[in-house]
Amino acid sequence: MGSTLPLAAASAHGFAVATLVLGGLLVLGALLSGLAGRSFLSLTAVFVIAGFALGDGGLGVLAFSPRSPFVAQLALVALVVILFRDGLEVEAEMLQKAWHLPFRKLALAMPLTALLVALVTRALVGLSWTESFLLGALLSPTDPVLSSAVVTNPRVPRIIRHSLNLESGMNDGLALPAVLALSAALGAGSGHFVWWEFVLQDLGVGLVTGLLVGALAARLLPRGRRLDAEMPAHQKSLFALGTAFATYGIAVLPPKGNGLIAVFVCAITLGILRPDVRLYFEQRAEDIVEIVKLGIFVVFGSLLTLHGLFGEGWAAVAVVAFTLLLARPLAVLVALAGTGTDGATKGFMAWFGPKGVATMTFALLVLSQNIPAGSRIFNLAALAVLTSIVAHGLTDTPGSEWLARRAEARPRAVLSSAAD
């Protein structure tokens, strides 16, 4: 009895600290949201810095183990919610008319980015080829959270918003099989691992599950006046969130498909068959998405230490700089060659490939496995994410406004030339 009282007191203290931090950061985020919209300040950067200051690298108030199942599961929940929201944003009209740009980036730019990162990592850091390709796979996806300032700006041309949104949503799920396959190859018993069967099963089951559950959810949801009569407004967003998590759960059950791809495909299917769901989700579920985003970035920040981030010295800085400034931009420019896309659009999409939740989640999954170089790979990925949060956070709002002004100036230029 005596031993349980200190344990209960410690648990209560930890819960009190967690609620204090969560409440304080929610208030801070709300107060700074207007400032962030008018300046280069990124709320994501604020939350990560707050997590770092409160974590082991700072005051030590937040103490999370990177190998804790809680951390990996929180990141996974964040991906499910965010991918589902982004999938609902995919419009059928744009999917039919403008599929070629995101497809080229997924099929060409993504693997080329991973290859370039792997080559430089092998040369500068000295990881094995498999470990280097694992880091390349971790850094190949872009982040739907950090892309939100662009894809939610209605003044930015729809083709750019659609391309970035579809790319950032799909490449999270597409990168996961490669991450897990390479992790398994580095682990024990890798001699019995057949990678192509693994990838085929993950992709196939995930895709089919997403299509079937999305179609079923669209059919179950009442239509027209019956919908308003039988389902209150707040229950419609709960229906959508429930569909997201149910899809993930079904997909990862035997025969074990890719739950993230299933969630995104389900959201696309549901959004196309029932466009009204998109409005319900935007009106009621955005607060949940924001809280999940806040939580994952604060936890991520609390796991960072200066010693870990710069454990590889200047080689780590060089790998991160190459990834953000050369690997992604070069890969996208190669992928978009011959598409007829203007130079400004190519340049913006080449630069805007932020690293965030997906890379964090996958790095945490790698760290939780018995991989000798797991900590080194995690810290390199973490430094890339932190640098990307700052760099892309500083440029997302100014960049989207520049694109918007440029797009709005085009019709006036055409009218002026016609009048002349």
What positions do the PLM features span?
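Transmembrane helical cores of multi-pass secondary ion antiporters/exchangers
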Residues: 1-420
